[in-house]
Amino acid sequence: MTHDLAASGLRFGIEEEFFLLDASDLDIVRSAPAGFVAACRDTLGEHFAEEMFECQVEVASPVFSTLAEAARFHGQARQRLAHLAMDFGLRSLCVGTHPFADWRRARSNPAAHFARLFEDQGRVARRSLVCGLHVHVEIPPSHDRMAVLQRVLPWLPLLLALSASSPFRGGRRSGLASYRRALCGEWPRMNIPPALPDEDAYRRHLALLREAGCIREDGQVWWMIRPSSHVPTLELRICDACPRLADALSLAGLFRALVGEALGAGPRTLPVARDACLEENYWQALRYGCAGRYLVGGRAVGAGDWLEMAWRQCRPQARQGNEWAYEHARGLLGETSASRQLRRYQTLRAAGQERHVALRRLVEELLEENLQPALAGPAGKRAHEGGRSFRPAAGAPMSIRGQE
């Protein structure tokens, strides 16, 4: 593979999850009104999907070649979903956790796929009222996806820190920048992937899990990064859903650059200390976000230094087309969604607002952020159309969305 293909030529896709709220009190709804799902399917087509709770939906993109394309599609999709929701007395909210919703009010989706999840995972699934951001980056067939995964993996806590948007749970401060990822840790096969060296080892591992009855299908391996089971991509799953679309686009661009660098790099041995440092860095990101101290190269560094190290490691070809993503991420170092939510809540409480009033105002501000226009790339182009579909080896078109 040439460095050009390993860089700006990498196609990608983005999946965003949303809560559905009652427009009157801004709490989650138990069920969407009759006709809402059908209206969403009519408007968003194959890019719309229901989720494991009836108060959640997902928008899965077509395939993009540039961040400007992604800005166009997702900017329009957020607007369309918001308008449809308002037509049905709802609001759509993209954030890691709803600041004051009670997970016990959420009604599980009765569809067979989701019913099996709740049967298998019990209360762990019931408690998982969270929204995430997933990014797919296409891996050329000449490269082994597990080998690329292992090269990218050590950087993932940095992406979590930048995306953190779930500091509240059930109306209380959780003490974590990403409470969503703490909940993910209750699930099997949802945290750090094992050190499998290549896709052959990965397939053998999946076969063992199926034979043992641990999983019903390959898609039930939910690691924070995984080879997709239905399209030729690596899927980033660690990030919280981003209230601001620009943040989501920045994370997609950074991940794409890191994958491009991994594709262009020669084979190397992973450090023995990887697991220990990765686990600690993951905790630092989950707990402190961009205020964490990260173990990199045998020393502790801040998120800003780590981001600069990540960008500096990427070859010019891997950076190409993703420069805006890095510049935007530098701005997130000063205030992520999680730290902004906490700051605003503290300001409102200090001004004498009751807790429930401050939390409602917080949701109102998050809803406003959801519809802020995103500027992707130096030209700041906005979009109204998407790209193509990934294709498997046989050549049949595929959607990036698959079973969770």
UniProtKB/Swiss-Prot annotation:
Reactions the enzyme catalyzes: L-cysteine + L-glutamate + ATP = gamma-L-glutamyl-L-cysteine + ADP + phosphate + H(+)
The entry's keywords: ATP-binding, Ligase, Nucleotide-binding
Region feature (Disordered): 377-404
Highest taxon of source: Bacteria
PANTHER family: GLUTAMATE--CYSTEINE LIGASE 2-RELATED (PTHR36510:SF1)
Family membership noted in the UniProt record: Belongs to the glutamate--cysteine ligase type 2 family. YbdK subfamily.
Protein name in the entry: Putative glutamate--cysteine ligase 2
